[in-house]
């Protein structure tokens, strides 16, 4: 049976991850730790014999720079890369820039967990005159008003990620190309939920660690037959638990 592989990678730790802030579409840089994480991911992929034919990422530099660091390590800097806003992080609305623990102290752990992990729950909206509104950013100039979010739930994130998967990425993977996607915690959760047909309850508890390669194997019908992380299982579990704890009051 022919097996096709796909690699998903959440970006390395960003400056706002380090500060425990809601980031969303805010374009923040990787921290020093995040750059190191991305480099280690690339080294791990190289050691495991992975090479790629094509790459996808978002239009946010923490994901783009994660991909660059990985491609440096596997010595494929020349690889064709397609960037799309449809792979952006979920838009966190008026929460963007706020500290997660302080927000939990104000609104309670359960409310923040629902904002972060609830399937159809949207954070408070931005207003269009807010400087954080994506309509003010030139990289989104081609988007229609309906496409510019004021906030997003995971369900709404799925609504933009899955058509991009079906129409753009999946045909390339199905053709036999070896593809890597460098994106974000929630855009990747959206894709994992779709690929694995997860329930809303299951996706609530899924936390994707930073810069750990997640490998999918597909059969000839593009049905997922295996999903696994590369790396030390205990370290990966600890990183995933740290992601889960970000939204709790101290």
Swiss-Prot record:
SUPFAM superfamilies: Phosphoglycerate mutase-like. Signal peptide: none annotated. Keywords: Gluconeogenesis, Glycolysis, Isomerase. It catalyses: (2R)-2-phosphoglycerate = (2R)-3-phosphoglycerate. It is an enzyme of class 5 (isomerase). One of its GO terms (molecular function) is phosphoglycerate mutase activity. The record marks 184 as: Transition state stabilizer. Substrate binds at residues 10-17, 23-24, 62, 89-92, 100, 116-117, 185-186. Pathway: Carbohydrate degradation; glycolysis; pyruvate from D-glyceraldehyde 3-phosphate: step 3/5. Its EC number is 5.4.2.11. SMART domains: PGAM. GO terms for biological process: gluconeogenesis; glycolytic process. It comes from the Bacteria. The active site is at 11 (tele-phosphohistidine intermediate), 89 (proton donor/acceptor). Belongs to the phosphoglycerate mutase family. BPG-dependent PGAM subfamily. Homodimer. Catalyzes the interconversion of 2-phosphoglycerate and 3-phosphoglycerate. This is 2,3-bisphosphoglycerate-dependent phosphoglycerate mutase. The gene is gpmA.
């Amino acid at each position: 049976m022919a097996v096709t592989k796909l690699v998903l990678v959440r970006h390395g730790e960003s400056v706002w991850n380090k500060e425990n802030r809601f980031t969303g579409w805010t374009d923040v840089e990787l921290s020093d730790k995040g750059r190191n994480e991305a480099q280690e991911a690339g080294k791990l992929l190289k050691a495991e014999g992975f090479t790629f034919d094509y790459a996808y990422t978002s239009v946010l530099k923490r994901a783009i720079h994660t991909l660059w660091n990985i491609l440096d390590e596997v010595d494929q800097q020349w690889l064709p890369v397609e960037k799309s806003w449809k792979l952006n992080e979920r838009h966190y609305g008026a929460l963007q820039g706020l500290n997660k623990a302080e927000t939990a102290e104000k609104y309670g752990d359960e409310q923040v967990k629902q904002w972060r992990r609830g399937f159809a729950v949207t954070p408070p909206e931005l207003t269009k005159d807010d400087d954080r509104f994506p309509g003010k950013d030139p990289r989104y100039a081609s988007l229609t008003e309906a496409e510019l979010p004021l906030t997003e739930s995971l369900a709404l994130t799925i609504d933009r990620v899955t058509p991009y998967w079906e129409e753009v990425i999946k045909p390339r993977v199905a053709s036999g190309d070896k593809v890597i996607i460098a994106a974000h915690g929630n855009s990747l959760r959206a894709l994992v939920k779709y690929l694995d047909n997860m329930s809303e309850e299951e996706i609530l508890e899924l936390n994707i660690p930073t810069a750990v390669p997640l490998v999918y194997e597909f059969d000839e019908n593009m049905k997922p037959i295996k999903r696994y992380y590369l790396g030390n299982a205990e370290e990966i579990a600890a990183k995933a638990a740290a992601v889960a704890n970000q939204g709790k009051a101290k």
